[in-house]
């Protein structure tokens, strides 16, 4: 048994799941052993990732790697919101999409990719643009919003919905060789 796996499972080959929906099962302990053994992280933090619901707005240049890392890290529920379709010119930087996805909605392509990477998560694709008619409904059931869009209209709307619902918001932006990241923790 790998040393990190042994430490994550407390040296046991199998960890019983006593029917608790809050405990990690053996598969999770093995898959996420490298997280679990990090000082200050442990099984509780991994369980919290598994139980979290994240809304990712945008499955393009920034959303693509974000979605891959969230699924690999063990986030349990991802909602992927994007109204665009995969274009061949996207493929060199939007690494979540494949040649076979050209012409498909990015939200659906990304959903398929994260489920291939981690078949134990729940992923929902919403082929739509964040708008005044759907923002609050989309945001309200999530623990975190990640705004990976490239326009101010959507960014302001995501920020307003986060403030109204009290949902933490992280927005990122990239342009050529530069990037910015901001975290908004709303306390109502």
Model-found features: residue ranges?
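Adenine nucleotide-associated cytosolic modules
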Residues: 1-186
């Amino acid at each position: 048994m790998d040393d990190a796996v042994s430490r994550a499972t407390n040296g046991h080959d199998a960890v019983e799941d006593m029917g608790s929906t809050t405990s990690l099962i053996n598969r999770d302990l093995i898959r996420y052993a490298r997280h679990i053994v990090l000082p200050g992280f442990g099984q509780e933090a991994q369980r919290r990732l598994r139980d979290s619901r994240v809304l990712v707005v945008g499955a393009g240049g920034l959303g693509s790697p974000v979605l891959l890392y969230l699924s690999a890290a063990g986030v349990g529920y991802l909602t992927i919101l994007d109204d665009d379709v995969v274009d061949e010119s996207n493929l060199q930087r939007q690494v979540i999409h494949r040649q076979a996805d050209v012409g498909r909605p990015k939200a659906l392509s990304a959903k398929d990719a994260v489920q291939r990477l981690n078949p134990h998560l729940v992923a929902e694709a919403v082929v739509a643009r964040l708008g005044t008619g759907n923002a609050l409904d989309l945001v309200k059931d999530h623990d975190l919003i990640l705004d990976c869009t490239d326009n101010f209209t959507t960014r302001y709307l995501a920020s307003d919905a986060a403030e109204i619902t009290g949902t933490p918001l992280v927005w990122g932006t990239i342009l050529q060789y530069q990037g910015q990241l901001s975290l908004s923790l709303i306390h109502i």
